[in-house]
Amino acid sequence: MPELPEVEVSRQGISPWLTGIKVTRVVVRDGRLRWPVPGEIQELVDLTIHRVSRRAKYLLLETDFGTAILHLGMSGSLRVLDIGTPAEKHDHVDIELANGKLLRLNDPRRFGALLWTREPAEAHALLAKLGPEPLTDAFNADYLRERAKGRSTAIKTFLMDNQVVVGVGNIYANEALYAAGIHPKRAAGNISAERLGTLVAEIKRVLAEAIRQGGTTLKDFTSADGKPGYFVQQLQVYGRGGQPCFHCHTLLSEIRLGQRTTVFCSHCQR
């Protein structure tokens, strides 16, 4: 599943091709995504995309009269191609542009979404209750300590709650907790302020490095130019259950926590 770094890499890839460009046509070959693509998406035609932004794992194509909201779901990807490029299997939607390019949504598993809102995007039901972005100053040690106060929830599950902080998905929660030396099952409210500060710093570092490396390609993700992400080569624990810890050589433990695969070092993480 594309997580925050992969979505940000996609945003960076498509933004130069879309920003300041008028939409000339929207082609919906099959609108049966997570939610049906609404007919109102045709309102995008003849509008100029002024900005391509991201909120959590949603991409926002902003115009003066509304915003198209894109989500890549489990296996979705976006490609910028020349108009007239033949569609292939699972190419569900094209947004054609006045510069001769098109933005193509491919989604084999159909858990993605393309929606339209005339209201401010931040007021949309999907976005209104989201927590802060992890790479902004709003996500800091004081904020996390206040949110964690009195919480018995396992810290990994706590971090993956998008009302606490957005975009810390399974891969990056595993990696940040390992880097911070915190056991994923430790109660969020039982972690010292100092250790929470370390955790915040590691979340920011891991996410920023993943974006720099182009994301993490496991099965489905490629960036807007079709290239894979290379952060997979930097993974310390995710996908390495049963293999030696790079620091102490203890075999890494793998458990299910919050219905997600969780990998950690029982020696290095307390």
Swiss-Prot record:
Q: Which domain of life is it from?
A: Bacteria
Q: Which residues form a coiled coil?
A: none
Q: InterPro entries under this entry?
A: DNA_glyclase/AP_lyase_DNA-bd, DNA_glyclase_Znf_dom_DNA_BS, Formamido-pyr_DNA_Glyclase, FPG_cat, MutM-like_N-ter, Ribosomal_uS13-like_H2TH, Znf_DNA_glyclase/AP_lyase, Znf_FPG/IleRS
- EC number(s) stated in the UniProt entry for this protein: 3.2.2.23, 4.2.99.18
Q: List, separated by semicolons, the cofactors it needs.
A: Zn(2+)
Annotated catalytic residues = 2 (schiff-base intermediate with dna), 3 (proton donor), 57 (proton donor), 260 (proton donor)
Q: Which residues bind DNA?
A: 90, 109, 151
Which residues are the signal sequence here?
Answer: none
Q: Which keywords label this protein? A: DNA damage, DNA repair, DNA-binding, Glycosidase, Hydrolase, Lyase, Metal-binding, Multifunctional enzyme, Zinc, Zinc-finger
What CDD domains does the entry give?
Answer: EcFpg-like_N
Q: Catalyses which reaction? A: Hydrolysis of DNA containing ring-opened 7-methylguanine residues, releasing 2,6-diamino-4-hydroxy-5-(N-methyl)formamidopyrimidine; 2'-deoxyribonucleotide-(2'-deoxyribose 5'-phosphate)-2'-deoxyribonucleotide-DNA = a 3'-end 2'-deoxyribonucleotide-(2,3-dehydro-2,3-deoxyribose 5'-phosphate)-DNA + a 5'-end 5'-phospho-2'-deoxyribonucleoside-DNA + H(+)
User: What function does the entry list?
Assistant: Involved in base excision repair of DNA damaged by oxidation or by mutagenic agents. Acts as a DNA glycosylase that recognizes and removes damaged bases. Has a preference for oxidized purines, such as 7,8-dihydro-8-oxoguanine (8-oxoG). Has AP (apurinic/apyrimidinic) lyase activity and introduces nicks in the DNA strand. Cleaves the DNA backbone by beta-delta elimination to generate a single-strand break at the site of the removed base with both 3'- and 5'-phosphates.
Q: How does it assemble?
A: Monomer.
Homology family? Belongs to the FPG family.
State the protein's name.
Formamidopyrimidine-DNA glycosylase
Species of provenance = Aeromonas hydrophila subsp. hydrophila (strain ATCC 7966 / DSM 30187 / BCRC 13018 / CCUG 14551 / JCM 1027 / KCTC 2358 / NCIMB 9240 / NCTC 8049)
